């Protein structure tokens, strides 16, 4: 009983929560003529607050149709209410293909993420989606 009261007083109350670490998502990659680009490297980057750290990267190659798909990753967790809040996930895309400009998003909230992205890559220099 004393431990429960102490936890409540400090704000560290554990509670169950169902977290989406990575949403189900799909990308269609095309050139500027709206033709599908196959074998483009698509990276779905999962990060979380309160620290803004990258948590994981999932990669896929586009099919001849220019499409790549990602499955959702979810789990039940026990979190504690802390001063900085709970862990909140957000996601970004990085898409690269030799001979085309790299596409990259810099989202910092989940609401900014497009889980049905259609992107056109202009010709140009490609940068790697590998971590800096």
How should each PLM-predicted stretch be described?
Residues 6, 10-24, 28-35, 43, ...:
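Beta-strand-rich domain onsets/edges
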Residues 33-49, 64:
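Short, ordered, surface-exposed loop/turn motifs in non-cytosolic proteins
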């Amino acid at each position: 009983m004393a431990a429960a009261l102490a936890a409540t007083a400090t704000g560290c109350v554990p509670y169950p929560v169902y977290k989406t670490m990575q949403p189900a998502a799909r990308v269609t990659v095309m050139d500027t003529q709206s033709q599908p680009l196959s074998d483009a490297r698509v990276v779905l980057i999962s990060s979380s607050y309160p620290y803004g750290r990258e948590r994981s990267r999932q990669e896929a190659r586009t099919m001849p149709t220019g499409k790549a798909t990602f499955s959702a990753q979810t789990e039940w967790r026990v979190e504690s209410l802390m001063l900085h809040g709970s862990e909140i996930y957000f996601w970004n895309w990085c898409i690269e293909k030799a001979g085309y400009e790299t596409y990259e998003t810099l989202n910092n909230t989940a609401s900014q993420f497009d889980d049905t992205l259609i992107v056109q890559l202009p010709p140009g220099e490609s940068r790697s989606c590998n971590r800096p």
